[in-house]
């Protein structure tokens, strides 16, 4: 007897949204034996999934999707169908409204509207999208007027680059609008999750996800403030953090050019939106949002002029992923262009970046400065010949490493002056 047969629930699952979370989730469920309908309103995305031509840096994702489709258990299309369970994995971006940043529930509301014609008594709706506290309860109140349904929130907790591994191994928190909803959702996830599954109410589950990312955002803000102080007083923040973290109860994260991605840079605002007491959270978010401008000012200070050519290495929000959402690089590039700089970006990982991407040679040709904004392994592993090639093309042998990843000695041997964000000893 399979887990699906044993649980006796949700033989048919409709997953709305086939992005970074929805596609792996739909594929994982299909492999477990569920009849899965994967839905995305983007026809191009649906076509690429069907043809297995979509781009991804996730290890083994293409193999998983291929297996799910070939099994006959995963069908991909642009419209929902009747199902026992509906899992919603759509974006919930942050928008500015009356001077305040708030969660934009447009995609979530459209997803809910799209499944309403197919809802039947006894159906379960699971929301994986990150949402402000109280959203799941609000959705339940609206939908339960006409039918007896169950609603739960099960926020994703995965790290891009390791999604499949963490989808299976990470613990999960599931919050239901009632105990039955939480239990029903648990029966779905325990078919593939090997980590522990903790049950609670919906509002607590919503807050747990926001707290996880807010904790990291506040910690990074502290590191970024330390970096600014280090430059001011003449110490190397990276050395200081490493030594401070020798204390068994201290774990300061790393500073950088800002915080990006669709979680850490967004989620804290959902708490601020709901509470006037979130003063520290707001301050941390504002500090991290200020870092791209800090980097731009540092560039101008280093090259000692207010115009020139800047080569940007790395436009994704973190290293070795293709995701450019909320990337600090976008803000850095935008500000530089606004101030009259010529900017060329190089990133072989990135997709869907708002500005054109160039080859390495194109980016560095005639550059006044190279700026590292993402910790891709490629940049860490530049060898002597790579650096010689770059040195032969730049106008000035100057590099600003905002992630502290370069082999400084190699670059200096080729005549480069290497600056590191937060290193006040070598400013």
From Swiss-Prot:
Give the GO molecular function terms.
NAD binding; oxidoreductase activity, acting on the CH-CH group of donors, NAD or NADP as acceptor; UDP-N-acetyl-D-mannosamine dehydrogenase activity
As recorded in UniProt, its EC number(s) are: 1.1.1.336
Give any single GO term for biological process: polysaccharide biosynthetic process
The record lists UDP-N-acetyl-alpha-D-mannosaminouronate as bound by: 157-158, 209, 213, 216, 247, 249, 260, 317-318, 403
Positions binding NAD(+) in this chain are 20-21, 40, 45, 92, 130, 325
Q: Which domain of life is it from?
A: Archaea
What does the record give as the reaction this protein catalyses?
Answer: UDP-N-acetyl-alpha-D-mannosamine + 2 NAD(+) + H2O = UDP-N-acetyl-alpha-D-mannosaminouronate + 2 NADH + 3 H(+)
Pfam families hit by this protein: UDPG_MGDP_dh (PF00984), UDPG_MGDP_dh_C (PF03720), UDPG_MGDP_dh_N (PF03721)
Catalytic residues in the record:
209 (proton donor/acceptor), 263 (nucleophile)
The coiled-coil segments of this chain are none
The UniProt keywords, alphabetically, are:
NAD, Oxidoreductase
How this chain assembles, per its entry, is: Homotetramer; probably dimer of dimers.
Family that this chain belongs to: Belongs to the UDP-glucose/GDP-mannose dehydrogenase family.
Summary of the function given for this chain in its UniProt record? Catalyzes the four-electron oxidation of UDP-N-acetyl-D-mannosamine (UDP-ManNAc), reducing NAD(+) and releasing UDP-N-acetylmannosaminuronic acid (UDP-ManNAcA).
Q: Under what name is this protein listed? A: UDP-N-acetyl-D-mannosamine dehydrogenase
Q: What is the lineage of its organism?
A: Archaea, Methanobacteriati, Methanobacteriota, Methanomada group, Methanococci
Give the gene name.
wecC
């Amino acid at each position: 007897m399979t887990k699906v047969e044993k649980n006796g629930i949700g033989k048919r699952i409709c997953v709305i949204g086939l992005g970074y979370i929805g596609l792996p989730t739909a594929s994982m469920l299909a492999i477990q034996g569920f009849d899965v309908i994967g839905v995305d309103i983007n026809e191009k995305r649906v076509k690429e999934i069907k043809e297995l031509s979509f781009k991804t840096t996730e290890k083994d994702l293409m193999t998983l999707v291929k297996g799910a489709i070939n099994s006959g258990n995963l069908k991909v299309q642009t419209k929902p169908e009747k199902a026992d369970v509906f899992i919603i994995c759509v974006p919930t971006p942050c928008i500015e409204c009356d001077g305040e940043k708030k969660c934009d529930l447009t995609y979530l509301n459209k997803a809910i509207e799209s499944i309403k014609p197919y809802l039947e008594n006894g159906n379960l709706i699971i929301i994986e999208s990150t949402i402000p506290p109280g959203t799941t309860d609000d959705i339940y109140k609206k939908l339960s007027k006409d039918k007896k349904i169950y609603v739960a929130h099960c926020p994703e907790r995965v790290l891009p680059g390791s999604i499949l591994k963490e989808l299976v191994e990470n613990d999960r928190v599931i919050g239901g609008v009632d105990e039955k909803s939480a239990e029903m959702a648990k029966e779905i996830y325990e078919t593939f999750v090997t980590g522990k599954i903790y049950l609670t109410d919906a509002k607590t589950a919503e807050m747990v996800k926001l707290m996880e990312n807010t904790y990291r955002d506040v910690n990074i803000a502290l590191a970024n403030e330390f970096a600014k102080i280090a430059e001011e007083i003449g110490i190397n923040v990276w050395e200081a953090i490493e030594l401070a973290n020798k204390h068994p109860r201290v774990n300061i994260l790393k500073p950088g050019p800002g915080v990006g991605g669709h979680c850490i840079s967004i989620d804290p605002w959902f708490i601020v939106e709901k509470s006037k007491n979130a003063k520290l959270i707001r301050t941390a978010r504002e500090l991290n949002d200020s870092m791209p401008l800090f980097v731009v000012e540092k560039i101008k200070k280093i090259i000692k002029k207010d115009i020139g050519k800047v080569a940007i290495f790395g436009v994704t929000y973190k290293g070795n992923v293709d995701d450019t959402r909320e990337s600090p690089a976008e803000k850095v590039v935008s500000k530089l262009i606004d101030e009259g700089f010529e900017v060329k970006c190089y990133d072989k990982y990135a997709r869907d970046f708002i500005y054109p991407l160039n080859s390495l040679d194109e980016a560095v040709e005639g550059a006044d400065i190279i700026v590292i904004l993402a910790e891709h392994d490629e940049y860490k592993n530049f060898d002597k010949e790579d650096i010689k090639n770059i040195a032969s093309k730049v106008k000035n042998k100057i590099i600003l490493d905002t992630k502290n990843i370069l082999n400084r000695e190699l670059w200096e041997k080729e005549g480069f002056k290497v600056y590191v964000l937060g290193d006040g000893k070598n400013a």
